[in-house]
Amino acid sequence: MENKKMHHKRYIAGGMVSLVFMIVCLTGLIVSASGAGNVNTDPSSDERVWNLGVIQMSVSNYWDGVWNLSFKRASDGFVEERNMRIEDAEAQKLYADISCGTVPDGSSLILWLVQGDKAESVDVTDLSEPLEYPLEGFEEGKIHVRLQINGVEDVTSEITIQ
């Protein structure tokens, strides 16, 4: 009878060791990611932007060169991004049809175009018509297209390069 009571202890001990190891690894990951300035939150940077906030009820898809994004609300400073390609910078333009349903005082929606050391931003909070933005100052190749969300809600957008 004593043998039946003892055989579960090693499984419990193994589970406890695994739990402690998992907590140590998670803590190490969080400390290494957030410490020493490793988290990039600058939307004008050519590096990947890490978000420290949340976005709610977000739908984002990229199909046939068109990026569609809609969301209910997001933390201030939240950045959504999509990499697109410029084939002919002299002839192509970025087209953005963006509408913000709710715009509280002091809120904004900023469109960032980033390629290498070049970064340009456009306030697209209150567009009365779709934006046509020339890409003449950029080079052919990959470009980061970012939306920096600062308090706006109920946003729908369609962005493409043609």
Q: Predicted regions: what is each one?
A:
Residues 122-127:
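Short beta-strand segments within Ig-like beta-sandwich modules, predominantly Fibronectin type-III
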Residues 104-120:
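Short, surface-exposed beta-strand/strand-loop-strand elements in extracellular ectodomains
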Residues 87-95, 140:
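Extended extracellular/luminal ectodomain segments enriched in beta-structured repeat modules
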Residues 99-109, 151-154:
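Extended, low-complexity, turn-rich repeat/linker tracts enriched in Gly/Pro/Ser/Thr and Asp/Glu
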Residues 80-82, 129-133, 141:
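Short strand-edge motifs at loop-to-beta-strand transitions and within beta-strands
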